[in-house]
Amino acid sequence: MWVRTTLTIERWTKEKTEPKARSWDEALSDVNRLPSWERGHLLAGVASSTDVSTFSEGGDCKEPDKCCWRHKQCTGHIIYPFASDCVRHSLHLHSVNHCNCNSRLKDSSEDSSSSRGAGPTCSHVIESPCFELTPEEEHVERFRYGWCKSYRPVSVAVIHHPLYHECGADDLNEEEEEEEEESKPPIPTQVGPATASPDLGTSMATGTPDSTAPITIWRSESPTGKGQGSKVIKKVKKKKEKEKDKEEMDEKAKLKKKAKKGQLTKKKSPVKLEPSPPDVSRSLSARQLARMSESSPESREELESEDSYNGRGQGELSSEDIVESSSPRKRENTVQAKKTGAKPSQARKVNKRKSPPGSNPNLS
């Protein structure tokens, strides 16, 4: 304890004995010399009745200082880290501001040089969200056993995720990228008829290229161009293989369905009946039927064999008649032959009938 007191006394005496030029005077301090992320904390203690023009009257950071002053007027709308406010509990390592205050700060830091350090870190690296207040009814009082006793409209914070914000540093980076692109030499591309190379050693052994055929050279600026082309080819191959597999599966399913349908139709279809023998009663006459009924079974078999033989002969004759009917010339010849053969017989008969009776010599 005694050591601590002596140390504190020594430090206090040293600070008091220092010259006045080196002492830090609050009246002569300039807000512009402080880093941009510390200004808000220092300006928070200043009364709101003071004029903004009194702070940072000159310098590059005039506009950001004014913006910080306006922004610190929103002190009532800040949710501090790991604190609960507006029915929300903040789990962020940084404070969450109201969206109106946040947008004002970003707009004022766009055209200023001081936004190069604070702007990108706050908007892109940290990605601090903002919130808006909406009135909702929430329970205010509770009973001892936990149920709500009374409700009241309370402003509830609705968190909004941050959007990409363009700062002065982004504009500088874009300008640098444009200058680098302009300084790069253009990539040579040849479109049109190819000229023959003067070196004969470099020519192909198979033959010289056609000079009339246009040649287009495609070059990818990115180093991963070849890998992307191979990936695309692999994807196309995989798609084709999948389509083939699907087609094979569909064909197999169709064959299975057809086999099942065939089995069902076989089960449902009735048994094929044997063709019934021709009715003998229709082909036979009444007399033959009577004979068959009276005669023995052996005689019936003989009669049936005779009838079948006669039927075959009739069938053969009918086929011959069909052949004759197919040829009209033969038919006419046969008709004429029949007519010529019938006429002399009729004439003979007529002569026999018309011949007068022979005269008897006795009567004369």
Swiss-Prot record:
Residues 232-241, 254-270 have a biased composition (Basic residues). High expressed in testis. InterPro entries: PLipase_A2_dom, PLipase_A2_dom_sf. Signal peptide: none annotated. Residues 242-253 have a biased composition (Basic and acidic residues). It comes from the Eukaryota. Residues 172-182 have a biased composition (Acidic residues). Keywords: Phosphoprotein. Residues 172-364 are annotated as: Disordered. GO terms for biological process: arachidonate secretion; phospholipid metabolic process. The keyword Phosphoprotein applies. Coiled coil: none annotated. The modification Phosphoserine is found at residues 276, 308, 318-319, 355, 364. Pfam families: Phospholip_A2_2. GO terms for molecular function: cyclin binding; phospholipase A2 activity. Residues 203-223 have a biased composition (Polar residues). Belongs to the PROCA1 family. This is Protein PROCA1. The lineage of its organism: Eukaryota, Metazoa, Chordata, Craniata, Vertebrata. The gene is PROCA1.
